[in-house]
Amino acid sequence: MNPATGKFEGIMAGEMADFLRHQRALGKRFINEERGLLLFDQYLIEQKIEAVTKITPELVDAFLASRPRSRPRSYNHLLSVVRRLFKWLVRQERWLQSPVQSRPRHATAAQTTFLFDRSQAQQLLKLAAELPDNNHGRNRGKIYFTIFALMYGLGLRVAEASRLCRQDVDLERKVLVIRETKFLKSRLVPFGPKIEARLREYLQREGALGPTTPLFSFAPDRSKPITSSTVTQTFHALWPRLGLKVPAGAASPRLHCLRHSFAVGTLLRWYRSGINPQQRLWDLSTFMGHVHPASTAVYLTITAELLDEANQRFHRFAAPLLKEVAQ
């Protein structure tokens, strides 16, 4: 690997580049996966592998061992990248068989996601709104308040919210245009009166902005949008000040928990409105920018409230049948 260019240079450089192009042609960003392939490419160079016959199961195991991962999920992701590369090469008939024989690590008991209820989210927004300006940026309170509100109220990813430009906010039609998201697709996200009011207030405070001007920026000339990492750091700085207790079995709160909270909150509202969530999961999946409802299902942490609503729904469905059986 050439550190300056980030290009593959080892014995499998051509195969890796072709695999990466194929995946991106399917609409995948493959950013983290590319990093994993670059690590493997660098390892092959360091080991002076100059013939593909030298790429054995033992070599793959040695590569994985050279990249210690404390969490099973991280290890399994790296293993998956290498495994997918060779599976693709076998399907393309460029390799006879895959040298990857390593098994995934078993994850420990999965922790649940911390979910913000309405009052907790309001606490976070209040703290964000009170953030003072500093040497690194002005209008910090309004910027972070609005970004967190968009994530909690519309389920946006942090990168989607932070990259918004003025032209992406259509107050007349009440929609946001989310451009080239995680899967290189764009989508429209409608918003209600509360989000509209917050966006109007924010835009009035900011004054006239050009169509491509970033909505959220600390740059004096507004040439660059706020970064996702900056928003994440601010969230983690605010979290201890909330004084909230993390339930037993729940993971430490992350900024992405706001998006999870939106998904679970939507499901709960559907239950309470008598809407069948199974019939609307595609709608939620599209709204959140997923390519398949299976991806959305990951966000739907089962809570006591959801279990209670699902139980009530089952009893309403089953009551007539149980009555017939009892007669």
Regions found by a protein language model. Name each.
Residues 1-327:
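Conserved catalytic core of the tyrosine transesterase superfamily
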